[in-house]
């Protein structure tokens, strides 16, 4: 009888570790996804009221775990961080790191050295930037 108790105890510990690990993984994925989708939420606001500006991509970083997800039309989008340099309306040189999702087919275009991207920034908070999706698409247009 005692070996059965030990076996059930071992099984319980293993299952607890699996469940807790799964909960931790889901929490991590939600946090990371939120970090990259925050830029899209800023675009919803800055697309209407933000100041347009051109920026130069200085560096592109892929997510360390190559995070991808489904895009707005079912395509695959990849998590990237674009390190950009731009000059605001007052003439102040600024830099920003913009975590966002880019369709996998467009990723090579962002890897080109010195690529120009179009941004919108908040004039009252120039550090709050978003990619101007009307001028620098992050997803390919689909035929309807």
Predicted features by range, described:
Residues 2-144:
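Oxidizing extracytosolic/periplasmic lumen-facing domains
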